[in-house]
C-alpha cells in the first residue's frame, strides 16, 4: 500500500490477503447461512489482528471522506477496518481537553455523524462490540 492509501487501495490490499480456509471458518462462526442471523455476510478470511494492523498503518492520515467506501464494502473485514479507523480517530480526539478546541470538537462531531449515518453497516455483533462503546459510549 502507498503511504497515504485510498479506500480502494486498502480494499485491494485486504483482498490480496484473502484466506479461503479461514473464510469458511468465519462464515460458520458468524452464522452466514440461509436463515441465520448473519445471512449473506461475506468474509475475506482475515483475522481481527490482521485488520487491526491495516488500521494501525493507515488510520492517522486516512481521510474521513474515504471511510464510507470501506463501510459500504461487501466484505465484513473491510467494514471492520472502516469502523476501527473511526474508533482510532475518535479515541485520539477523546484524549484531548475539548473545552477550548473548536476544531477537535468539530472533528469528533464529524466522526460521530459519519458513524451514525453508516450504523446499519455494523450489521454483526462483533462490528457493534468493537465500535459502539468506543464512539457512542463516550
Please place each PLM-identified region on the residue numbering.
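Alpha-helical scaffold domains
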Residues: 1-138
Amino acid at each position: 500500500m502507498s503511504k497515504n492509501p485510498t479506500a480502494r487501495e486498502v480494499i485491494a490490499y485486504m483482498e490480496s490477503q484473502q484466506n479461503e480456509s479461514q473464510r469458511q471458518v468465519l462464515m460458520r462462526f458468524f452464522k452466514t447461512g440461509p436463515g441465520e442471523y448473519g445471512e449473506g455476510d461475506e468474509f475475506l478470511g482475515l483475522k481481527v489482528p490482521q485488520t487491526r494492523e491495516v488500521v494501525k498503518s493507515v488510520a492517522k492520515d486516512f481521510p474521513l471522506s474515504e471511510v464510507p467506501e470501506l463501510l459500504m464494502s461487501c466484505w465484513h473485514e473491510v467494514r471492520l477496518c472502516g469502523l476501527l479507523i473511526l474508533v482510532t480517530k475518535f479515541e485520539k480526539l477523546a484524549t484531548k481537553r475539548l473545552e477550548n478546541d473548536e476544531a477537535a470538537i468539530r472533528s469528533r462531531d464529524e466522526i460521530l455523524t459519519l458513524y451514525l449515518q453508516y450504523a446499519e453497516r455494523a450489521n454483526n455483533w462483533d462490528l457493534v462490540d468493537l465500535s459502539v462503546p468506543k464512539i457512542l459510549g463516550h
